[in-house]
């Protein structure tokens, strides 16, 4: 399944290294630097809830991470990549 993890950092200056460390976790598939509540917002793919917990603990272990907040995706309702690809192929 898919989960989204908002990451709170101790300091903004740790953002670059935190992203490097996130890149070393293969189950983190997307990461964004964001404004607002979180410093970094990422997408995680997990096999099950235990696997998701393990991934979240890996993220929590990154130096500079203060805490995380996780949201589990119940359903993908809109996927612009899929719509865009269908449109491109239909125009060919």
Regions found by a protein language model. Give the residues of each.
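A compositional/biophysical signature of low hydrophobicity enriched in polar/charged and small residues
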Residues: 1-92
């Amino acid at each position: 399944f898919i989960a989204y993890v908002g990451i709170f950092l101790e300091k903004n200056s740790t953002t670059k290294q935190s992203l490097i460390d996130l890149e070393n976790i293969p189950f983190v598939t997307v990461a964004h630097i964001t404004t607002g509540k979180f410093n970094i917002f990422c997408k995680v793919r997990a096999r099950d809830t235990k696997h998701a917990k393990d991934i979240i603990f890996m993220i929590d272990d990154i130096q500079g991470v203060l805490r995380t907040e996780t949201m589990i995706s119940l359903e993908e309702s809109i996927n612009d990549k899929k719509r865009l690809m269908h449109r491109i192929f239909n125009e060919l």
